[in-house]
Regions:
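P-loop NTPase catalytic core
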Residues: 1-231
Length: 231
């Protein structure tokens, strides 16, 4: 919800689509009521696998048409795990990977996730998808590993921080982006490396969040961080 609200507020010209697969009805209702400016497409857990797949296909094709028309589109998918489970339930190739995953069941979810791109003559499509981990299901672990290497950014949540009511509950050391040197200035990249090294040894997550909350931009954080770190 926070991501969708931030996108609609910070990038009012973008098209934000929230796709909820195999979700609880009360969660769907909550998101529809609290997120304005975004389209919510859903297939709740009381619907069958074919309905889950149909909803995902409709969203992807609609997003592609918007991109062709020059729009910048963001799909927030919750979750790629449940979508792959749906395909796994209706696929029977006769082969099986660890955890009971049919390798053919990965084809369409990969196409969905791989549709994200920045086009030269049109708009762009960004896909931010959640993946379930630590569920006790070997199938979920295999799905996560299959998609882990496909993304350009990975944000890992921390159960420990959530239990301590420290939000956002992000495992910073395990999170990161590919090609971050293209996203950050040399000074920002250097500070990022320093903070990762200090985190957990000489600096707590609370201290880091306090530093971030006291600044409005990355550039300001870079300027003031040296002073704070030397205290």
């Amino acid at each position: 919800k926070d991501i969708a609200c931030s996108l609609t507020a910070g990038y009012p010209g973008s098209e934000v689509i929230i796709l909820l697969i195999d979700e609880r009805p009360e969660e769907v209702t909550d998101i529809r009521r609290t997120v304005s400016g975004a389209r919510v497409v859903y297939s709740t857990f009381d619907r069958g696998e074919h309905h889950h797949i149909h909803a995902a296909n409709l969203v992807l094709e609609h997003a592609k048409r918007l991109v062709e028309a020059g729009k910048d589109v963001v799909i927030l998918l919750d979750s790629i795990t449940r979508l792959t489970r749906a395909y796994n339930s209706v696929t029977n190739s006769g082969r099986m990977l660890s955890g009971g995953l049919d390798p053919q069941a990965l084809i369409e979810p990969r196409k969905f996730f791989g549709a994200a791109r920045n086009t030269e003559d049109g708009g762009s499509l960004t896909i931010i998808a959640t993946a379930l981990v630590d569920t006790g299901s070997r199938l979920d672990d295999v799905i996560y590993e299959e998609f882990k290497a496909a993304g350009n950014m990975e944000l890992v949540l921390s159960r420990e921080l959530a239990e301590r009511r420290i939000f956002p509950a992000i495992d910073i050391k395990s999170s990161g982006a590919r090609k971050e040197e293209l996203l950050l200035s040399p000074e920002e990249l250097d500070l990022s490396c320093k903070l990762r090294q200090l985190l957990g040894r000489q600096m707590s997550v609370e201290a880091l969040y306090s530093m971030i909350n006291k600044t409005k931009t990355n550039a300001e954080l870079v300027l003031r961080a040296e002073e704070w770190l030397n205290k």
